[in-house]
Amino acid sequence: MLYRNRDLDLDARNDDLANSNSDGRITQVTRTLYSKWKLIKMKTYKNLYPKLCSYKNLELAFKKAGKGKSKKFYVIKFKKELKQNLFSLKKELELETYKPSRLTKFTIRDPKTRLIRKSIFKDRIVHHAIVNILEPIYEPRFITDNYANRLNKGTISALERFDIFKRKVSKNGKLVSHALTNNMIKGYVFKADIRKFFDSINQAKMIEILQRKIKDEKVIWLIAKVLKNFDDKKKGMPLGNMTSQFFANLYLNDLDQFVKRKLKMRYYIRYVDDFIILHESKEVLKNCRDKIEKYLKNLRLELHPDKSKIYSLYKGVDFLGFKTFYYHRIARKRNIKGFKKKLITLKIKHKEGSINYNKFMESVCGWFAYVMWGNTYKLRKNIIKNINRFLLDNSLSS
């Protein structure tokens, strides 16, 4: 997949490269890459449904849906008669009699309060089966700097990319002309958040986006079934479904293309509904903000007025759980508070015996692996002391 490596599939430079073909300034390799990109852009897909319904695909979907949940009762129950259950599901899909079950609702605080709607295990297998077919089609069309729910991406990669972009925009840390301290670095960041994103996704628009490439009516029928299994039959997608994560990326891919190709913004990063654009000019970013607000109306979305602002780079930007400055990065207070609450719950569960030592440490280490990307040495040191004291007391009392 050579055409993926240098953003030739999605960057605005594609059009410039094609236009420069006449004066012989581009190489044969570049012309070949551009041709491949054009073919990918124009290609449509039919006869996908038999592959989606195949036993092989459903078996793979079962493995993905059950990953890390092998001890859950619903996975054990489904696995007991795996072949029979998968063939039964296959038949439902082929006869188009499949109907998703009602969603289970529950609230989580991480630390933000979110309403999660969860599908039963059988429906989750169908979700994975759909994504197994669609992901290879759409993955080459996503921009490099879309970091949510993608292989070899994630928050850490997005933060690393942010570090690269801030150095480029500030010309490696040049100071503003009126700098009073060595921290007053050049450059600006437009930090934006889409208001009530998952609840605002227009289902008809989502189908319209899919139909540009997917010309198999049965696949569209199944996706429509999944989308409409929601409180509101016209808009919104449930947080928690595999399909929701994938469709969220696809829905905002139009925005990504607009920012990169039309606005020609090189330093753009998106993670689900949070995105940032870096530039040396505040006026350019103001213009971008206005055009993005207008463009989002086509997607029936709007920017969050309180969370979408332009900041001086040296003042720091809240992004993906950290406030990032030019020379350092600190963890958000609410994230630290949220973890400390979670740690109390983990301690209680470990003391009661509902989770073992390995499970306890797995949860702790997962958070540590993330927060160590900030300047959090003292914080981590204090939490480690707290955990060691708890484990020692717990071992003495048992």
List PLM regions with ranges.
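Gly/Ser/Thr-rich beta-alpha loop segments that engage phosphate groups in nucleotides
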Residues: 75, 156, 238, 242, ...
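C-terminal, surface-exposed recognition/capping segments
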Residues: 1-37
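Conserved polymerase palm-domain catalytic core
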Residues: 85, 91-93, 160-161, 165-272, ...
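Short, conserved aromatic-histidine micro-motifs
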Residues: 96-100, 263-272, 339-354
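Right-hand nucleic-acid polymerase module
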Residues: 119, 128, 286-287, 303-398
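Conserved two-metal-ion catalytic palm core of "right-hand" nucleic acid polymerases
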Residues: 36-206, 214-215, 227, 231
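Short alpha-helical "patches" and their helix-cap loops
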Residues: 140-154, 262-272, 382-388
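Intrinsically disordered, low-complexity and often Lys/Arg-enriched segments
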Residues: 18, 31-48, 175-180, 384-398
